Structure formats: C-alpha cells, structure tokens
Amino acid sequence: MALSLYRPDLEVNNTAQTRLTSQYDNLDQLSSAFKVKHTTQSYQAQFASLYYLRLAKLKKLTQNRSIEKWNEIPGQSQKPKFYSRVLDVDQNQLSYVVGTVYMDMKLKPNVLDDLARNKEAEANGIKHWVAAPQPTEKIYSDNDELCLEDESGRIKLVGPIIANTQLVTGIIIGVLGIEKDPGEFTVLDVCYPGVPPQPSKSASMDSDKSPLVAIVSGLRLGSQVANDALARRMFIDFISGRQGGSADQGLSSRITRLVIAGNCMSPPVAHVDDKKPKRFGQDQASFTSLPSTDFDNFLVELSSYVEIDILPGPDDPAGTLLPQQPFPKAMFKRAHDNFEQGSIVCHTNPTWFSIDETRLLVSSGQTIDDCFKYVRGDSRLGLAVDSLKWRHIAPTAPDTLWCYPFTDKDPFILNECPHIFVNGNQSQFETELVEGPEGQQARVVNLPQFTETSTIAIVNLDTLECQPVTFTTSDGASKADGDDKENDKSGAKVEDDGEDLIPDDDSAGEL
C-alpha cells in the first residue's frame, strides 16, 4: 500500500485536524538506573563486579526455571542432578548447572596481544608503535570456544546442541548435559531466564482511532547531501500534517509523540586550511557548528506540532560509554524554551518511558551491533528478540561494549518486559511481535538510519501493529522498494506489515 504525499489527483485539505494527546511518563523507577550522576562518578572500580552483579541477580531465577524444566525428564530413567557450582559437576552424571556464558574468540581484539606486538617490534629494532588491526563486523569463527563460568571457575561447553545455539558473552543460562571428559560438558538442552513479566495496559475500543508513535533514527542533521535534506523536509511535512489529503492528515494527527533514536547530528568534519603556512604542533582544525544548529532548528519546528523524545547515538556529541547520558539543554539555544515546557525530552541511551500505559524501551543500536559480532548468522532482529528471553539488553558489556563500571547494579537487566522495544541505526527495517508464555506481548522494531533508507516506523500504541513509512524522491528512487516509477514527484511509501494504518483513497479519511 502506497501513501503519496504529492498526489495531484487528491485535493489538499487545508482544514487542520486536531492532534490526539497522550499521557506521558518518563518511568523514573526504570529510566533512573541509566543515569550516572556527576557527583558519584568513579572509574576506579573493576568491571568484573558487573558480571557478579548480573549473575547474582539472574542465577536464582534461571535456576528455578531449570529445576522446573528438568526436574523430571519424560523417558529418562536417570533423574538429573543440579549443581550450584560449575566445578562441582561429577563426570558421567546427567546434571544441570547455571552460569555466565563466556566466548573465547580468536578474532576478538585483545590489548595484551597489542602490547605483545609492540614488544616484538621493539625487539626487532622498530621504534614506532605497531598499528592495531582494523575492526571487523564479525569476530566469530569456527574455532571459538564456549564456556560457562561462575564464582568457582569455568567449564567448556561442547556438543552440537550448544554449537547451534545463538549465544553471546555475558548472558546467564542453565545447561543440561553430561561431563564425559574432564572439563568438557556435553550440552543436551539450554534454559534461559525467560521473558520478564509485563505490566498490563488498557486498550482502546476503536483501534482505528488509536494513538500512534513515530520513531526515527539516523537523521544526521547538518548533512550536506541534497537528497537527505529533501527527505527530511518530506518527513517534517508528514509529521506536521501539512501535506496530502484528509487521510494523510488524519494519520499524522494520531501521532502523539516522535522518538529520535540516536545519530541525530552529522559527525563533525575537521577543516584545515592547506594554503596557510604550517606551524607544527600549533595548527588547530576548525569544526562547523552546522549539525547542532540544524538540529536545534529542526526541534523548534517539529516540537510545535508533536512532542519529541531524543536519545544520543554512537556518532553524536555524547560520551562513548553506555549508558550515554542525555544531551545538555545548553546545546539548543532556540529550542531551550521547548525543553522547559516539556515538549522536548532528552533521554539517556538506552531509556524507558511510557505513552498511554504503553511502555517503550529504546536503544540507539550499539547493543545489537556489538552482539552481532558474536554470532554466525545475519539476523539482527533475532538478537533483539533473544534479548527479551535473556532478560538483558547489553550482555557483551563490558567485555567488548564499553560501559560505565557500575558497582551496585546492572542497569541493562530487564526486570519487566516492554510493550515496544526499539533498536535504532540498524542495517534494515525489521519487526516482530513477540508473545511470552504468560501473555506478554512485545513489539520489537529494528530501525535503519534515515539517511540511508529515508524510513521511519509508526507503531499503534493499542494494537502494537507497526508499519514502516519510506519517503522517496525521483533522484533517490532506489532508496525504497516498490516506488511508483510513473510518478516523477516526491512521494512516500508505506510497507504493509499486518495492519493498514493508512486507508485507501476511497475511505472517509478516518483510520
């Protein structure tokens, strides 16, 4: 189904439609865990404490689920025995144990290897530092070893079952199996902490008039690419309801909030004047302020139509450690009053908040990007879905994903299941409705960068149905599949994913 923002056959309705409003809650009881106070910041602690906190929090839960699952196995005369420590497992005994997954990966960057290369270079008379290897999208290889560890030690996991299970370093699991050879545990089954409980929410009786939330990532304001600017202009006109007929405006009037999930601004580019004489050690590169200025202007314009939630991303001017802290309001001179009025909210990355009792967990994508390095497959959506049953959204932190060295909590543990789970800045649009064993329903959305695909997502807050909206231009028609090649004017395409959020042209304009 296509939604054209520029349709000459459709009379534009200049009568402004009243935008729906929603109840908003920043969920301090959940989101505050991601906030690092400047007064208590300390980087003196070791990262190992984070693993112990994670294991202490999830071990008992996983143990209870393992006992429930394996206490008695149909058709098995031998009753499995539970061991509380991995090094206590007896040989040739059907047993199960709970611990933290650790993947010993040959391709994983290692600072000790870097130091060894530098020492070797110095021994060979090389006086400069050896360059570090280039980062790769994958660090997985067939020679990797999978281990399970706890406070007692580590045991190697082997067998076809575990080899074909998608795991990453840092998750807590229970494994059923037999230690046939010393130090090697042949896995027969795996148990996870499971999807956490989910708060109930009321649903609207008329889903065609339910409020919607629009989600975008990778806007990269300040980019000088002409097609990016045109797509953003179309996006603004769509959200504000200034484009199209009554059906299009009816859709935009149901959007109660806009979520910007990271990479809001274009990365700065250094400019050095090559013509002026060089004074080594004193030359300074100059940077343009265009990205922050453009983002400021963008927020001022859109916040007059819809309330906005902002998360920093990996390429934004924010700290590199997770959780990234909110943008300072001082960055936005023109939009400052909008922050004070509450129409714009700056969040940590990741963050929690709710709209009309629908709870959203939003990340700018670093967590999925890092987990993706560990697995053989290419499904980023599968990793996002697995995060729910792992009850953890950043298991590879702090091993390969930089994070703050928390000493009293692991904020990335999921104590409850969100209704909408968003990961921004992914390679493509993907979505799935996950249903848990206790009636949980979570809409998982992986969203690509807007500058790459000109795509946003719209989610119905009542039904959790989701559709991508792709804005295309005649110069960038390759950005969206299924473009109307007979129409030379700019348009937008809505890809169907289960629910028609956009009515046909012969409808009355209500959705």
Residue spans of the language-model regions?
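Extended recognition/assembly regions associated with phosphoester-bond processing machinery
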Residues: 1-511
